[in-house]
């Protein structure tokens, strides 16, 4: 959870990190199929995406249970969401040589497998480019229902100890979506350590980095007590 650095707070830690240098370190540490998940709000979200369009894959939205921004409610709509930007060297698609890591949560296995064929629009390629490879002989099998969407609804944790603290349940969801038990998760701006608690709860190893001494000690204590 990087500092957004949008000049909207007076916290000394809320200064935008130099993204070019950050990506050098991420690329050095990241495994070939590793995932980078970063939270953001505009205009910071756009800066994140533009900082590495080669590895940008998609964006999700964290929808909160209640809005924020009441102090400026006379001037703009209340805010109900934050962005989650996903980067990877892996790519999306069944024919990818390096498929992106993705372990969708909450799937329900179907008792009866559903088999589909592309409709006439897909078969003709109209509107999808002339090189569309789908054809009438291709069959697509659906084994599961309840596939996740890009809208993630999670309530904020009560008694938060950091101004931008993310819900442990949301972080657990992301960790389980992109990693397996025993693997390593790093949070280089860990704040109060919620990602560390989420890793402990889900059986992952954790590396946490925090520049602020107070929050580092707070995170250490929270993780040890979890």
List each language-model region with its residue ranges.
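Conserved Class I SAM-dependent methyltransferase catalytic core
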Residues: 5, 12-69, 82, 86-87
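Active-site residues of response regulator receiver
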Residues: 1
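Class I S-adenosyl-L-methionine
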Residues: 8-9, 50-226
